[in-house]
Amino acid sequence: MTLKALLVTALALCHGFNLDTEHPMTFQENAKGFGQNVVQLGGTSVVVAAPQEAKAVNQTGALYQCDYSTSRCHPIPLQVPPEAVNMSLGLSLAVSTVPQQLLACGPTVHQNCKENTYVNGLCYLFGSNLLRPPQQFPEALRECPQQESDIVFLIDGSGSINNIDFQKMKEFVSTVMEQFKKSKTLFSLMQYSDEFRIHFTFNDFKRNPSPRSHVSPIKQLNGRTKTASGIRKVVRELFHKTNGARENAAKILVVITDGEKFGDPLDYKDVIPEADRAGVIRYVIGVGNAFNKPQSRRELDTIASKPAGEHVFQVDNFEALNTIQNQLQEKIFAIEGTQTGSTSSFEHEMSQEGFSASITSNGPLLGSVGSFDWAGGAFLYTSKDKVTFINTTRVDSDMNDAYLGYASAVILRNRVQSLVLGAPRYQHIGLVVMFRENFGTWEPHTSIKGSQIGSYFGASLCSVDMDADGNTNLILIGAPHYYEKTRGGQVSVCPLPRGRARWQCEALLHGDQGHPWGRFGAALTVLGDVNGDKLTDVAIGAPGEQENQGAVYIFYGASIASLSASHSHRIIGAHFSPGLQYFGQSLSGGKDLTMDGLMDLAVGAQGHLLLLRAQPVLRLEATMEFSPKKVARSVFACQEQVLKNKDAGEVRVCLRVRKNTKDRLREGDIQSTVTYDLALDPVRSRIRAFFDETKNNTRRRTQVFGLMQKCETLKLILPDCVDDSVSPIILRLNYTLVGEPLRSFGNLRPVLAMDAQRFFTAMFPFEKNCGNDSICQDDLSITMSAMGLDTLVVGGPQDFNMSVTLRNDGEDSYGTQVTVYYPSGLSYRKDSASQNPLTKKPWFVKPAESSSSSEGHGALKSTTWNINHPIFPANSEVTFNVTFDVDSHASFGNKLLLKAIVASENNMSRTHKTKFQLELPVKYAIYMIVTSDESSIRYLNFTASEMTSKVIQHQYQFNNLGQRSLPVSVVFWIPVQINNVTVWDHPQVIFSQNLSSACHTEQKSPPHSNFRDQLERTPVLNCSVAVCKRIQCDLPSFNTQEIFNVTLKGNLSFDWYIKTSHGHLLLVSSTEILFNDSAFALLPGQESYVRSKTETKVEPYEVHNPVPLIVGSSIGGLVLLALITAGLYKLGFFKRQYKDMMNEAAPQDAPPQ
């Protein structure tokens, strides 16, 4: 992306469309929290709160009035009462127009009640004159809460106390009781010694709350000190509802004694745990020196509640009791039970009244989030004396910590007022409740719950009157902490329910991606109609975006009950100042502060108020009229492409700028600079027309417009012959508009409406060649042929060619299309068209679309061709060939059916000529092989004297290599007889598999009777010379890729053998596969594969007698042996020479004598 593009994108992000973000008026005060809340007061003023500003000791919060006319802010004087401690004035603000009122609240007033600090609120209602003292609501802070307490005095009446001290003890008790005179405290008293006497119960005190009338008549009992038993009796009897004890009151026991217990059968370990379980808080007062001993002191610690140091008082004598009465009173007052039973420990002590504020027709409505354990609610002040508390506890008991009243809004429908309160912490998901008045009582009418834990659904509310008729149409509910991975916060758009219908939110609004902590929806306001569409627009703040720099989103009204789903613009705080923080934390709109009649927006940021002015919105209207209305045929029709530059006509272009918004601006002052571009046929690569002025198909001009119309006339030229004379020439106008600053209104600049039409088009059509009536009536006809093919063999050649011929014997045909419907086993591959005799080029035939329907058995496909679009001329004929691929697995039945339909945009009625149906017989290619197996007996021999027969077998293998299963018949031919002599005796047909087959046999005579001559010529014994058995076996299904073997077996005798010059004969059997040739076909050259034969060579031989040969051979061998022996003897072979050799050697070897 270029630097320029990045800059344009950045400007688009921050530009507020018709909110002037370039010249905002900024107010800044050095007051802590300034800008946290803002409201438009009316006139030219905005009230800005600074709730954290410390004006004096224990006084926080201030109000400022910022005026557009003076560009300055000044504090609003307010005399705050001294009890308004740290009230955070201005934390909530509200205004009303009729009458003009300002309601400012400080909901953090700190009120100290004894040892506790409570948080309440004070609000001030100003009239039109902010200098006059406002009314205060409530008129005074509530009194400190009084704790219900049931107090029992257990006094020691033993004999160790003299009468004077006993009277002092009675005076002490009376004085302490009188100090609780205006509290919610009841008293009871028991005296103990050896016996126990209840002098008055809680019921007695309730009937007569005079302490002295109960205490004065008491007489001392005297006796021993049974303190433990007295404590048990108090716990079990006096703290009982029969004696007036209250279930939720604090139970307090005050024990006054002068010594250790004595004579008591009970130990403290027997009674103190019971008192603890009953929740009795025990104070013990030890009187006298007896408790100076460690053991006695430990007894006091045992009696008292823990820690003992907080609950034990020790004085030296009864005279000193008056020194501890204030201490005892303060400790009892400090007892604040947290929560007992089902009763909340807090009612309105922590109310924070005024946390939200609205002005109703009855009076101020102040949200009270802390009431009743932060269940919340609201106070409605109809007069100074009449206050109504509104909450939902009667309907929904599970409202603890819900913060009802965190936000508030007022609804007006048919002059009936309703109230809406938000409870963002209800069950951690949030709740918004609508209240309606029923005979003076505000009751919940309907409600909406949030969806995400922690989203703070209901933290902000805004009622919207979409059409400014005085009736509320919808409520905006903010959930600023709604979390998604890439953005934070959302706003629900909730139209008001009709009748008893359920209240539902129909849409959700979000900020931009990339800001998970953006808090979108933290502030909501009505803008009014800022874009002039007569629907109310709204602004939504997201102060946490861009690391807390903040942003404001503008959403336009979409209808009377909805807003646009996406924002029209986003204004970021960083655009105004890099250091600006929390821009959009508060918003106020809907009023004209700049006296120009346009609604303005006040935006609060940390330490700043920014006033964004609305800008007037303009729209541009354009008209373009051609003269003549159509391009004449004489201009564009030609047979050859020749440059002509003919005058096509003129176009009159008129522009008018109108103001879309209602304002106080003078129409004569509004001007804008308009740059507009004209383009002829802007999307075509080859232009069909151009402007005579520019010699191009484009033209640009810039003019300054007021709120008036300007026109100009332009001449159009056609440079060439037009191929496409059906589509009109398109003239497109697009423009930019920049408003000129209005000097008299602070350089306010008009802007073009965001949804304005940015380009305009006009069409310059061509005159049609349709006769005088201007209605083209074509006369189309269509035929098809299979291009000489008489039968389609499926599984053979993979393509199928067809010829389509189309004629138009009428006028020009527009948008002519041919659609061919064909079975799903065909697939369109290509086409080729014949030549157009006019242009000497091929006709333009182009496939437009293909579709298929897979419903039912007859699934069809279709292909549509555009024929010479856009015009198929009159008296023309085109032929184009179409090639389909044929699926080898397809099944068409016994014929292929193709249907063609021709149609056009002329909308002529269909005739029989516009349809054609082509039928073509179909056969299915098969591929089967039968072969002679090697296991067949190929050779047999015999002697003339041999009379026994030999076994012979011929074996064949059958294989279906094709893609289809089919029924077949297997036929075998076996020679069984020649010259009335049996050759193959009892032939058998044996299948290798258990096939379902039916075989039948018949005997066939040879065609040749002169079998000897035949065998002499050819030594082959087959069915041409011998009688044969024809065995036919019918198989119902020969499955794809199936293989089976068949063996022909029998006995072969040799009586039939006929000698020939060849010395042998060939015995031949044969087989053949038969099938239905009307449905199936063999591919060319495969006819021999379905036939086979097996030959066995049969040869005779002679058997010779071996005895003469053996005898002759033996005698001859003996004679030959005798002759050889005689010859050797004659030669001396058998004479011994050893003796002669010994004789010759004797004289030489004799030893000497």
UniProtKB/Swiss-Prot annotation:
Q: Where is the signal peptide?
A: 1-16
Deleted gene: phenotype: Mice are born at the expected Mendelian rate. The numbers of blood leukocytes are normal and neutrophils rolling on blood vessels is not affected. Impaired LTB4-induced neutrophil adhesion to venules. Numbers of mast cells in the peritoneal cavity, peritoneal wall and in the dorsal skin are reduced. In an experimental model of thioglycolate-induced peritonitis, abnormal accumulation of recruited neutrophils due to impaired apoptosis.
Transmembrane region(s)? 1106-1129
At which residues are the FG-GAP repeats?
Answer: 18-75, 76-135, 339-390, 391-442, 443-503, 506-564, 569-629
Q: Which SMART domains match?
A: Int_alpha, VWA
Q: Does the keyword Transmembrane apply?
A: yes
Q: Which family does it belong to?
A: Belongs to the integrin alpha chain family.
Let me see what the UniProt entry remarks about domains.
Answer: The integrin I-domain (insert) is a VWFA domain. Integrins with I-domains do not undergo protease cleavage.
User: How does the annotation summarize its subunit structure?
Assistant: Heterodimer of an alpha and a beta subunit. ITGAM associates with ITGB2. Found in a complex with CD177 and ITGB2/CD18. Interacts with JAM3. Interacts with THBD. Interacts with complement factor H/CFH; this interaction mediates adhesion of neutrophils to pathogens leading to pathogen clearance. Interacts with TMEM268; this interaction inhibits ITGAM degradation via the endosome-lysosome pathway.
Q: Which PANTHER family match?
A: INTEGRIN ALPHA, INTEGRIN ALPHA-M
Protein name per the record: Integrin alpha-M
Q: What organism does this protein naturally occur in?
A: Mus musculus (Mouse)
